[in-house]
């Protein structure tokens, strides 16, 4: 696999025209030149056309960190992306100049035991777009391994291609939880990841889905996108007991799998209490690094807690879902911006405000 274009390199013939959005400090983004590495034999150079803003991007902007990842030097932001190939390496046979592609943003080592087991998303040497110190993809162009670029079918837009990244989180979560036609699903959180997890669950033939959030606007969107029931809750831990009853009533039967797409004390406590004996709670969101939750009662009911980190081998299935119409991600894109300094600043401010903004997309 090629080396990719995630760090500054030497000898790019397009360096004079390649600009990127650099995170240079708290709440400070600057569009500045980004020097690309040369295209290796297994790489492609891609002109970015659609790049989405992820919650992690906003975390980095507001705090210069996300979970244990800390930005110590200026970094190009962005990792949800699709574009058009402008140059291919000499060993690349399955892609040609002009192909529209969605990019899987993580390069693993392919040598460690985890990679050999197929769990490359857990590779300790992973180089992932916009995860410090690795640069991201909110740029005019990037260089990336061809094997991580997936050709878009004719009926899938570049914006939908960029949405394969967040959708992959939901698809991987559904695989980890082994949902199917006999699985009733509860989703905690109606933000972008909660919504794509809901859409993925439906594509996996889940018969009944209840989604929970504190925000009535996001719940309304969830209902429009196909949630069977929505439940508005509070942020108060004292309300867990009464809200669990409300959620279980809304489901109307056992809750087999709960996806916690927020990752807070309250949501995890609710998930553990609401899920049936012998069910699964899948931790998708990473809101709190450390949580205090009632694990002992959950253990006594043999509720399995399943971790989810990014994704693996999901792009082909995501594209299949989009092509077939099983999943429609277009309604999730609520705001669009160009790639000027002001538009970049406005886009991140819009995304940070939340509520009415689900997915903010750059059109380059």
Swiss-Prot record:
Cofactor: Zn(2+)
Organism: Arabidopsis thaliana
Membrane-related topology note: Peripheral membrane protein
Gene designation per UniProt: SDH
Catalysed conversion reaction: keto-D-fructose + NADH + H(+) = D-sorbitol + NAD(+); ribitol + NAD(+) = D-ribulose + NADH + H(+); xylitol + NAD(+) = D-xylulose + NADH + H(+)
Functional note: Polyol dehydrogenase that catalyzes the NAD(+)-dependent oxidation of various sugar alcohols. Is mostly active with D-sorbitol (D-glucitol), ribitol and xylitol as substrates, leading to the C2-oxidized products D-fructose, D-ribulose and D-xylulose, respectively. To a lesser extent, can also oxidize arabitol, mannitol, lactitol and maltitol in vitro. Is required for sorbitol metabolism. Cannot use NADP(+) as the electron acceptor.
Superkingdom of this protein's organism: Eukaryota
Keywords from the UniProt entry: Cell membrane, Cytoplasm, Membrane, Metal-binding, Mitochondrion, NAD, Oxidoreductase, Zinc
Protein name as it appears in the record: Sorbitol dehydrogenase
